[in-house]
Every structure is written in structure tokens, then in C-alpha cells.
Amino acid sequence: MRYILDIKMEIVQEILDQLYRKVLLGTTLEDDVHGYIFYLNPDLSEQDGCPAFPVAQSNASGVLDGMAGQHGPSSHEVATLPGAQECPKRQLQMDRTREMKLLQLTVIDTMLSQVLSDETETHAKEGYRELTEVLLQSVELDSKLMRMLQNSDKLLSHMAAKCLASLLYFQLREKVRSQHKMLSNSWVTFCQKHLSESSESGEAVRCLWILTAVIKEILKDTHSQRAESLKQLLTPFDITFEVFYNSLFSQHFGDFQSPSNLASSLMCFLELLELLVASRIHLKLHFRSQRMLFLKPHALDILAWPIPAFIKRKLVILVKKCLLCKVGEDLCREPAPSLMSPDHLLDSDMLTLADTLLHAVHVGLWKALAVSGKPSCFGGDEVQPGCRLRTGPDHVTLRAASLITVKSLEIKSQNCTSAAEMKVALQTFMSELLAFLKPHLQPSLQPHNPCEWLSRVFIEQDDDMLEAAKASLSIYLQLTREWDASASLTQEKEAWIRSTHGHGCNPHCVFLFFLKNVAFDSTVLLDFLISSETCFLEYFVKYLKLLQKDWAHFLSICKFFAAVESQCGMLVHDPVPSPARGRSTSLTVPHAPASPVGENTCPWLPWASDASSESQSQVMMPKETLPVPANGPPSRTPQSLVDYDSSEASEEETTSEHLANSKQTSLCQERSEEIQGLPRTWEEQKEHSLEPLLSAESSSPFSAKGRVAADGTVWQVGLFLRTVKCLEELQGAIYRLQEKNLFPYNPAALLKLLKGVEAKCVNV
């Protein structure tokens, strides 16, 4: 009998294997699909852990002779093998049972994928759909998969969850298509029960995983009824999600019984929260569960829990995506639809989240966040034997925490009622951020120019750097508009400008540090402009508008940068004890000296009002500086994506190729290291003199040929001329691409702004 039993198992496995191959290729099922129900029933091999198949000898011989017999046994052929429950080789047969179950689940999951695929041939798809519906009706496939979720075998449990997710998505699609099919009631009840009872049970984690998988499939789909499908899924779970959210995040860490189950629950639920927010933005649904993270942001409390760092990192990144409205970009195949009218509800929720986050920062959120230097190790914190432990902070978390602070401050500033309130918010929260960053940035930030923090923190991530720069610029513009509304507040405006510098938000400093990071390479700016991302374009346009209005301030900043590099030498980049520690928020910055300063001091920023008595043509620069070629050492010269000076090369380039090669992060890092590594010391610059930055006889306002040193080098002509030369080259490159119809959009407005800056240079 045992020999016959082994034969029957081989028969079933061979039939399943053939069915799997057919389904994998999308082949039409030639035989009656009902014949396969017997072999796809998950209960087929279950009888006290041992196989006990109803089989017939005639059917077995038919299958072994080339599968000529029928796929399922007839009722008169069924015979139960005696003694099957007493299995001497129990472990071997249990292993075979497990393998057959896995094969069954693989066939079912593949079949559901073919049903949902647009590439499957119509006739074959109908056969797979019919077989799936019969499985649901005759053997209650969904209920049996739910029982398998609780199997101690992790692989079986995972495959059952995977099949159940595909089955639920199939039901949602079919319900929308036929308008009468229902989502599995047993599944809804199962989920509601376990999500309401415990926030750290294994069943709750599996429910979260399945729901997440279904929502991902909905977001990735391209059919026009995605919103309706998601609505059908979320409706029975809207209240359940909120109950689970409160249960998970309202407790103290010590109240949880299993740290490992808690970590799994947190990871799964954070991913579900991200998808809920993404569906709100991309599908324009408005469920209460989609607003939980905004209305009840006490999820931030887990940043102080003793949980693995990768969970905290995931939460911080999720908040960052929410504030930037970039949730779900990696799933949805099309960008978020532009709103025909402002979404005031979303704006209100954003403000709530920003206010809560800033309040948490004020009471010490970042002080409690440990930014260790241990690598993530694919989501874990343990370093494997033989792997070298990297030193330094977790830059991913550091960047995300910095960006959400600045972005929250931007949102708050847009809703402040007065300039004084904005100023207090800036001083309070930027002080907290700079204090958080200070121990993690080596070498330390320059004490005389905290604005360097932005380029230092985001040097490896240009997208986040541009978002932070744009938010910082928006804060500055918002407050300056308030000051400009009253002409009697000149002194207060000057104090505000000093405050932006002291708290790392001066837009001119930020822009100049950005240019230094990219080595004043105009092709890097051009690559950003022709990228599919619009963040740099938005930032650049706003800054060019500000530059024309705030020209005197910009010249003063350039003078400050040049004087610091001349007088302090390498002190600009070396750690220096900060005199700003412990100072009051009403910072008073000394005036820049008109003559060389002492050997151990650094000049401070001269403000626009201080420079008003001087002629703008007399902005001073050091005459003797280290001779470095204009574009740096030849071996380190940045390589442009396109040779814009070659007409043939430009004509051969297509716009899509430009867009595909838009990122220059590694170039930015390389050039920044080159600039910071220049051997400029005090001894080399002790003997120096000053001369005008620009002369009236300069051949072109957008030219770097004015007032170079006697040795003919260009580096020492000053930050101002390097900036002007970069903008000149950018303007020329845009013109050339526009003439050849290679620029991806109409750059007329951008060129007009660049011409406006050129006109400012004429008057210098």
C-alpha cells in the first residue's frame, strides 16, 4: 500500500508540474478546468500530517502512461488506502506533503498573475478565471489559505499570504468589473478580529502584509478603476486601521511583550501608512485612515523608543515624503495629478503635521534620536563577521531629519500671522537643528558661517539638497515680504538678515556654497535644469528673482566669503571652537574690517547697509592667493554630459539622453572635496593686499577677465567672478540648445532672469 501511496503522490506532483508549466507560459487549458480542482485543493494531502489520497489504480496507470486518464478521479473509483495514517516514514512523507503544498500555492499564485496580466491571451485568461472562481466557490480557497497563514512553517505561511493577496486583488478587480461579486467576508472578519485584538500578534502582522501587498498592486495598476478598487478595500477597514494605529503608537514601549513582534508590526504598519497617504495623493480618496499620520502624529514618539535604528529611519523618511508630497512615487507609474483647485484639507493636515513635528523638535526630539554610524545591513543593525564597521553618522537619517525640520519650518512660516512670529520660529528651530547636526559633521561647521550646513549634510543627495535649499529660500522670501510691507522697519529687516545668516538660512550663502560644491561648473547646473525633476528649476528661478532685488546684499556676501578665505585660510574648513555657542537669538554680527585683520581672527559678514557707503565697484578681493587653474587641476576637471561647444555632438544628442543623465551627485562630492582640500594656509597669505573686485573697464559684465593677478591665473579673481562666469556659461549653453530645439521646455523666462543678472553686472 505504501508503494501505491508513493505512486499517487508522484502522479499528483507530475500533474501539478505540468499545470504549472502551462500556466507559466500562459497556455490555454485544453481539458475541462474542473478536473484540476482536485489537485489544487490545499486539503488534498492533509490527514493528520500524512498523505491519504483518494485514488484509483486505473487512473494511476493512465497518468503514468502519459497523462491519458482524466485529471480527477470519478466517484466510483475513490478508495481510501488502509493504514495510511500509520506512516513509518512520517518525516519523509511530511516533507513530500510540504513540497506538494508549495507547488499547489505556486500554481495558484501564477494562475492569478496571468488572470490579472494584460499580456495573457484572452481565451487562456478566461480559463484561468473560471478555474479560480470554481476554487473559491467549491473548496473555499480563501478560508483554507487563511488557515495556512498560521502555519509554523514560515515558507508555507508566506506563500499562503502571497496567494491570498493575489486572490483578494482578483476579487476586487472582478467586483468592479462585474458589479456584483463581493470581497471575501471571511477575510474581512479575520482581519478585523486580529487587528483589533493585538497590535503585535503574528496574525496582525500577516494581515498588514497582505493588505499592503493588495494596495501596492492597486497603485501599480494602470486601469481606470483603481480608485473604486481601493475604495472597496478600505471601506470595511477604515475604523479598524485607526483602532490599530492608536493601540500601536499610544502605548509605552515597556507595555509590549515581544520586541521582535513589535518590530515586525511597526515595519508593516509604517509601510501601510505610506501607501494610505500615497493613495490619498494619487487617487484622491478621502478616508479617515489616510489622515491618521497627519491628525495623530504621535507615531513620532517611537523615535525615542529603544527599537532598531532602521525602524526609526523608515519613519523619518516617511514623514519627509509626506511633507514633500512624494509618497508613492516609486509605485505609481504616473505622477500625481495636478490639482484643479487647492486641496485645503491636505494643506491643513500638512500644517498639523508640521506643527507637531516642530513642537517635538522643541522639546528635544532630535536629542533623543541616535544617529549611529552602523550600516543598515539590509534592514538590520548587526555587522556580519569579517565586515568592517564604518564610522560616522547615518547620513540617510541625518538628511531626512534635517529636511523635515526645514520643510516644517517653511510650512509654518507660510501660516504665521506676523514677521516677529516667523523670526522667533526660525531662531528656535534652526538652533535646535544646528545643535543636532554639530556633533555629526566633521570637520565642524564654520563658526562664522553656519549656512554651510546645508551643502555639507546633503552633499551626497542632490534631490534632498535642492528641496532643503528651496524651503530655506521660501522661508527667507516669506519674511522679507513682511518687512518690505513697512518702510519704517529697515533696522529690523537688517537684524532679520543677520539672523538668517546666524541660523544657517541666508540664501546667498546657501547658493554660493552650492556652487562651490559643484566647482562652479555650469554644465552641472544645466543637467539639473534639463532633468525631469523640476525642483532645481523652481529654486533657481526664485533665487534669480531675489538676486536682482538683493544685489547689494549678494555683493557683501561675496566680499565676506573672499575675506574669510583670504584671512583664515584653512581655518575655514578646520574645526574651530564656536563663539556662537550659548549666544542669544538676537545675534549681533561685527562689521567686516576695512583693513587686514589679526592673524588669529576671521572677518564677519558685512551687511548691505554697511556697504551702502562704499561704491559697489570697490568690493575688495585679495590680490595674492594660491595660483590654481580656473577649472581646478586638469586631472580633476569635471566632465560634461554633452560637449556643448561641439555643434555636431550637440545635434546628435536627444532630449531623452539629456534627461537620462541628469544627476551629478558623485561629481558634486568630488569637486567639493577638491575645493576643501586646497592647501591654502595663513603663511601663504600673510603678505597680501586688496584690490577692486571689478573694474569699470571690464570687457563684459558676464566675463571673468577683469582684474586677474599678474601670474594670469583665474582662481584668485574672487568668488563673485567665478559665480558670474558660471552663469554666463549657463546662459550660453541654454541659448545653443534652444537654437537647436534640444531644450526640453521653453527657457524664455529663465533666460530673461539671467539677462537681468547680466544687467546688474553692467552697473558694477
From Swiss-Prot:
UniProt biased composition (Acidic residues): 645-654
Give a yes or no for keyword Phosphoprotein in this entry: yes
Looking at the record's lineage, which domain of life comes first? Eukaryota
Kindly list the positions at which Phosphoserine occurs in this protein: 650
GO biological process assignments = cognition
PANTHER family assigned to the protein according to its UniProt record, in alphabetical order: PROTEIN LINES HOMOLOG 1, WINS1, 2 PROTEIN
Spell out the Low complexity composition-biased ranges: 691-702
Q: Which UniProt keywords apply?
A: Phosphoprotein
Q: Which family does it belong to?
A: Belongs to the protein lines family.
State the protein's name: Protein Lines homolog 1
Comp. bias regions, Polar residues: 658-668
Note down the stretches annotated as region Disordered.
Answer: 615-668, 682-702
Q: Could you tell me the gene encoding this protein?
A: Lins1
